Swiss-Prot record:
NCBIfam families: QueF. Keywords: Cytoplasm, NADP, Oxidoreductase, Queuosine biosynthesis. Homodimer. This is NADPH-dependent 7-cyano-7-deazaguanine reductase. Catalyzes the NADPH-dependent reduction of 7-cyano-7-deazaguanine (preQ0) to 7-aminomethyl-7-deazaguanine (preQ1). The gene is queF. Substrate binds at residues 81-83, 216-217. Its EC number is 1.7.1.13. One of its GO terms (cellular component) is cytoplasm. NADPH binds at residues 83-84, 245-246. It comes from Xanthomonas campestris pv. campestris (strain B100).
């Protein structure tokens, strides 16, 4: 079984001189899910949406082409794709000739699907940037915080009263690469229907990820599971928009299966 320590993270590697799908490094999701009490049927559906900013190849005549792309990895896939390996894989296309842009798109989709163990969709282009963002920010709350990890679900609580449907947001999420320790920065949005979530407790909880080491996808699943258990919403959506590294950013989203309306798709201003 692949582990993060077996990947190219934190190691000097030679950039590929030609197309090489073996560079893609899948990491099973099961271990990360077991750490937060997830096994068997998942309490959510969703995807890991990747934005690729540095995509290039050669056309049939050897002329370079450039593009951006959006990749959707379903959360039901048995494996996630380690980000440095995806960067190296995409770079392996730089000196490779393709007959058409569609051939590039199809090749990337096939290779990612094979490694992830589920159908991965690929489309050229990126979602628009939303400078305002979705939801009501909780970042201006005037509270003192001195707990930066490990993540503490005990901070999460609800208030008795009328059921609400609201969207809350924070730009203060930070976690760290589990191999290199590099900081990962993100804006997080949660949309839910249920008893009102205590906002001070929610902010303390999100800040308690600050010293936590885990992959982006697993952080979002931990947040979803903790909110589900501690706050018992009727339905819930959690999405994090991580900032770019190596020409890629990752945007995991997890939603309750009964989520009534589709999510809007956009990029954060910091992306």
């Amino acid at each position: 079984m692949n582990t993060p320590e077996d990947s190219s993270l934190g190691r000097e590697v030679a950039y590929p001189s030609g197309y090489d799908p073996s560079l893609l490094f899948p990491i099973p999701r099961a271990a990360g899910r077991a750490a937060v009490g997830l096994s068997g049927a998942l309490p959510f559906v969703g995807r890991d949406r990747w934005h690729a900013y540095e995509l290039s190849w050669l056309d049939a005549h050897g002329k370079p082409c450039v593009a951006t792309a959006t990749l959707h990895v379903p959360c039901e896939s048995p494996a996630l794709i380690e980000s440095k390996s995806l960067k190296l894989y995409l770079n392996s296309l730089n000196a490779t000739r393709f007959n058409s842009a569609e051939a590039v798109r199809a090749r990337i989709a096939t290779d990612l699907s094979t490694r992830a163990g589920a159908d991965v969709s690929v489309e050229f282009g990126l979602p628009p940037i939303d400078a305002v963002g979705e939801g009501e920010s909780i970042d201006a709350l005037d509270i003192a915080i001195d707990d930066y990890g490990p993540p503490k679900a005990d901070y999460l609580a609800t208030h008795a009263g009328t059921v609400v449907e609201e969207v809350l947001a924070s730009a203060l999420l930070k976690s760290n690469c589990p191999v290199t320790g590099q900081p990962d920065w993100a804006s997080v949005t949660l949309r839910y229907r249920g008893a009102p979530i205590d906002r001070e407790g929610l902010l303390r909880y999100l800040v308690s990820f600050r010293d936590h080491a885990d992959f982006h996808e697993q952080c979002v699943e931990r947040i979803f599971q903790d909110l589900l258990v501690r706050c018992a919403p009727q339905w819930l959506v959690v999405e994090a928009r991580y900032t770019r590294r190596g020409g890629l950013d990752i945007n995991p989203v997890r939603t309750s299966p009964q989520m009534p309306t589709p999510l809007s798709i956009f990029r954060d201003l910091r992306q």
